[in-house]
């Protein structure tokens, strides 16, 4: 992979007010992106955002930079990331830009791009944008400046698109669903989709104030959702992250259902319906239980690097149509071009309705192995993963697992973290082993 200065695995991200998430940087980024994208002919860009208070500031900066490069911006307002990908395709825009830091706290924000076909920008285009950033900013002639406009009923367009992925002969009548929108971009989308399909919806995490996005709610913290599902005696709960590209579910007993289990349900249903093409793609973090369960069904399984862009790349290479991360990014290429929490949820609900089974029962064919993830923050210049003591302890743990588990150490693509994952048959042992490795990483971080 190339050494890009600003772009990580999911665009550009950081703390608001610190480089690169500053108004001047984002203005320059908009200009540089405009210069690169204008070479392809179209001069229209779609811009969406989540509900962070900083979105207004960054949206204005992006628009100014694009206009200076001669490109026009069409705004969606607060909108899920996958909605921007969809609108980019339907409006035949040269690119879509999302202002979001996904599951991060409100004081972070980020910028990510979609190409004209609704997929993430290729590495070479991101590299070209970074190269343009090194040049002095110049403004086009006044007659060539870009304009700004707002897309009429962007939410309604996307709601109808989502509903179109649910079988027309079915409805959600009789289902009680709790939905947690993380005070994020799905707050005005997901409840409407589910209600219009017939469900009784209890909505939480749907009162964004600019600073409560992902705060003890949504896909990264389902405790509120679990409690509400039990209190309401609901059939199922759906939790999205701040920008709506992740889905975590909760069954009627209050059990969390993660991206691995969601992928299993969708793959199994695709096989049952005779619609599964090839196999399923997970990641290095996918639970061994998923691999075992799919193998029992005769469904091929492959692991990509962590990051939804790498899941998508492997899906495209293999010609497979479904893939997911255990964090809840679920990509269904027969339905859309990127991870989409609402659409993934609708496919699981389809399986519930068609099979007359609860979410709990749909998960019963897959047994999760205990998996412990410890995040260790590092600030030093030395790479903890290259340290010999860390490597030795990791090797010792791998020997102890003796092929009945896995160890994975990796750097986060979006934060200064080392992620330590240990997976095995016995939870107490796995916890102790993960902490041993994490302590070794901390000692050299």
Swiss-Prot record:
Broad EC category: isomerase
Processing after translation: Activated by phosphorylation.
GO molecular function terms noted in the UniProt entry: magnesium ion binding; phosphoglucosamine mutase activity; phosphomannomutase activity
Binding-site list for Mg(2+): 102, 241, 243, 245
Cofactor-binding details, from the entry: Binds 1 Mg(2+) ion per subunit.
Modified-residue entries (Phosphoserine), positions: 102
Cofactor(s) it depends on: Mg(2+)
Catalytic residue positions: 102
GO biological process: carbohydrate metabolic process; peptidoglycan biosynthetic process; UDP-N-acetylglucosamine biosynthetic process
Gene Ontology cellular-component terms listed: cytosol
EC number: 5.4.2.10
Substrates-to-products reaction catalysed: alpha-D-glucosamine 1-phosphate = D-glucosamine 6-phosphate
Keywords, alphabetical: Isomerase, Magnesium, Metal-binding, Phosphoprotein
Role summary: Catalyzes the conversion of glucosamine-6-phosphate to glucosamine-1-phosphate.
HAMAP family membership: GlmM_B
Similarity comment: family membership: Belongs to the phosphohexose mutase family.
Annotated protein name in UniProt: Phosphoglucosamine mutase
The encoding gene: glmM
């Amino acid at each position: 992979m190339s050494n890009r200065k600003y772009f990580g695995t999911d665009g550009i991200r950081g703390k608001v007010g610190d480089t690169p998430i500053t108004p001047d940087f984002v203005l320059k980024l908009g200009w540089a992106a405009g210069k690169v994208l204008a070479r392809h002919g179209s001069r229209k860009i779609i811009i969406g955002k989540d509900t962070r208070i900083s979105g207004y500031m960054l949206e204005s900066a992006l628009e100014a930079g694009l206009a200076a490069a001669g490109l026009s911006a069409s705004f969606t307002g607060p909108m899920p990331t996958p909605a921007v990908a969809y609108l980019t395709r339907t409006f035949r825009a040269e690119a879509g830009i999302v202002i979001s830091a996904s599951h991060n706290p409100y004081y972070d924000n980020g910028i990510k791009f979609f190409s004209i076909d609704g997929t993430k920008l290729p590495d070479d285009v991101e590299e070209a944008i970074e190269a343009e950033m090194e040049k002095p900013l110049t403004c086009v002639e006044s007659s060539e400046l870009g304009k700004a406009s707002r897309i009429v009923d962007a939410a309604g367009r996307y709601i109808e698109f989502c509903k179109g992925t649910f079988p027309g002969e079915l409805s959600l009548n009789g289902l009680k669903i709790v939905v947690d929108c993380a005070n994020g971009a799905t707050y005005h989308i997901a409840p409407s989709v589910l209600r219009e399909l017939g469900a009784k919806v209890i909505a939480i995490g749907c009162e964004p104030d600019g600073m409560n996005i992902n705060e003890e709610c949504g896909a990264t913290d389902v405790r509120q959702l679990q409690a509400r599902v039990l209190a309401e005696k609901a059939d199922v709960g759906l939790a999205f992250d701040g920008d709506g590209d992740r889905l975590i579910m909760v069954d009627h007993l209050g059990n969390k259902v993660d991206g691995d289990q969601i992928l299993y349900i969708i793959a199994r249903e695709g096989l049952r319906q005779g619609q599964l093409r090839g196999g399923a793609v997970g990641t290095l973090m996918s639970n061994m239980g998923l691999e075992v369960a799919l193998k029992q069904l005769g469904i091929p399984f492959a692991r990509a690097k962590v990051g939804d862009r790498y899941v998508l790349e492997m899906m495209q290479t293999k010609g497979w149509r479904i893939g997911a991360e255990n964090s809840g990014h679920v990509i269904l290429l027969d339905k859309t071009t990127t991870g989409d929490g609402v659409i993934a949820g609708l496919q699981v609900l389809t399986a519930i309705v068609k099979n007359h089974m609860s979410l709990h029962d749909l998960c019963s064919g897959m047994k999760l192995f205990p998996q412990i993830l410890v995040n260790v923050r590092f600030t030093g210049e030395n790479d903890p993963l290259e340290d010999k003591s860390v490597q030795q302890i990791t090797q010792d743990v791998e020997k102890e697992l003796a092929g009945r588990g896995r160890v994975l150490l990796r750097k986060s693509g979006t934060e200064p973290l080392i992620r330590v994952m240990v997976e095995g048959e016995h939870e107490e042992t796995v916890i102790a082993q993960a902490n041993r490795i994490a302590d070794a990483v901390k000692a050299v971080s």
